C-alpha cells in the first residue's frame, strides 16, 4: 500500500472574494497565484515545485492562495477554500511525501484536477555497450515527477527494457539478467526480482492491464513476433501476421482493447479487441508512428514522424490527431493520471510535457548526468 499521509482537509468559506487568476501566454493559462511560506524548507520547496508542475499554480509572493504554518499545522487559504495539513514529519523525505499529498489535495480543491505528485515514474538509466553486438545494459530507476528522491533499483550490468507498473509496489520488465531474455517481476520496496514468464525467443514489449491481472506481450516463441495476452500460466494469441512485426502494446482504460505498433519497413498504430481479436488501423499519416500510450480519459498519446508528440482519439484515429510538440527527438510518452501531462524522453533527459494548447513548456524532470530513457508513469 502506498504510505498514507494523513491530511486534515477542511473546505470552508475562509476568505471572501475570488482567487487572483493570471493568464500567462506560452506557459499555461489561468493559473492560481500561490505563495508558500512554511517553516520546513523541504516541505515548502517540494510543495511549490509540485504545484507549479501541475499547470494550475504559479508562485507569487503576493499570491491569492497562501500556504503558511509549520510541521503539523500547515494551512492553504484562498478564494473561499481552506485546506489543512496536520501530518507530523521528522526528516526531509517524509516532509516531501507530506508535501506531495498536500499538493494533490490543492490541485483537486482549487483546480478540480487529479494530482500526480505521489505517482512514481519508472525509467531506465542507459549504460554503455561493452562489445559490438552485445546488449546495452539498462538499470531500473524510479523518481517522482518533482525530480526528488531518485532511486536506482538495479545495478547488475544487464539489459532491462519496457519497465511497466503492475501496481504501486510492483514493476514488470524484460531483462536478460539470468542469461535468456525473459519477463521479470520486481518488488520495488525490497528490490527483489523473480522471473515471471519464460518463452523461447525474445519478448520485445509488454503492457499491464488496468486491473493488473493480465499482461499484453510481444512474443516470438511460435515464430513471428505477435501480440499475446498472458494471465497466470495461460496465454492467448491475438494477432497472426507472418509478414509483419508487432510491438509496443498498451491497454485501453477498460481493459477490452490493446493498441500496438505493426510494421517492419513502416510502422503504424493498430487496435485489437481482446475478446473478438478483430483489429483496425488507427494511423495512416506518415510511415513511422510509434510508442502509443492509452490514457485514463481514453486518448492515445504517441510519437509521429520526426519525433513529434501527438494525441488522438481512438474512435477517429489520426484524423483527430493534435500535435503537442514540434518535431524533435521525443520518445516513449507516458500519461499522468490527470489526463493532461505526459512524461517523455528527449535526448538523454526526461521531460514533463503539458498536452494542453498553450500549456506549459516542457520541463526537465531532473538534471543529472546520465542517459535516461523509457519512462512509464504509475496511473
Feature locations, PLM:
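Hydrophobic h-region of N-terminal signal peptides that target proteins for export
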Residues: 9-17
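Positively charged n-region of N-terminal signal peptides that target proteins for export
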Residues: 1-4
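Sequence signature of WD/YWTD-type beta-propeller architectures
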Residues: 19-21, 26-379
